[in-house]
Amino acid sequence: MKRLVIYVHGKGGSAEEAKHYRPLFAESDVIGFDYHAQTPWEAKYEFPRFFDLHSKGYDSVILIANSIGAYFSMNALAGKKLSRAMFISPIVDMERLITDIMMWAKVTEAELESKKEISTEFGETLSWEYLCYVRKYPIRWSIPTRILYGGKDHLTSRETISGFADRIGADLTVMEDGEHWFHTEEQMNVLDHWISNSIRPL
């Protein structure tokens, strides 16, 4: 069986991160997706074209996606033929994240609607168009999925990730000392072990 693994990075990441996963998928082709999309509607255009171009000739395609890369993937690739997905610290409720950022920045919905975009002191720009989009197009995902979540994730609550996993029937693994960004030696060891276990049949 000819198998392709597509890796989708998170914010600030790069397609080069796919190299980390190649030893874990020795009998598969592993590629990283160096996407340019900054919004889910841009991803909806860009992601399917990448998938269609690179998945030709493969019997099985596995998706590994990180953080907002997972959100963009679920928004754009739900209708594609994926054998399974593995999400690391996925953003699964973008509306909740945006409203949380609004609360942290003390921005009301009326203010955002009026100004359309508001920059925050912690580097995120709030967008009324973005908020309206995520409300209009909620995530619908039925691909067999496994999720790795850090107990200290500051962007997605335990309640949110557990509820999402239950809703889509995903297997959820929690590393209590893990953060949103898995990067320490211990965290990466847990990630690698989780990937190895996830390769087995779901």
Model-inferred region functions:
Residues 17, 37-56:
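Alpha/beta-hydrolase active-site loop
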Residues 1-39:
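Short, surface-exposed "cap/lid" segments of acyl-processing enzymes
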Residues 2-3, 58-61, 83, 143-144:
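Short coil/turn segments at beta-strand junctions that form active-site/ligand-binding loops
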Residues 81-163, 167-202:
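The alpha/beta-hydrolase serine catalytic core
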Residues 6-11, 64, 88, 148:
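Short hydrophobic segments within beta-strands
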Residues 14, 18-22, 73, 161, ...:
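Short, highly selective alpha-helical patches that border small-molecule cofactor pockets
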Residues 64-73:
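Gly/Ala-rich beta-loop-alpha elbow adjacent to hydrolase catalytic centers
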Residues 76-80:
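Aromatic pocket-lining residues of Rossmann-like dinucleotide-binding sites
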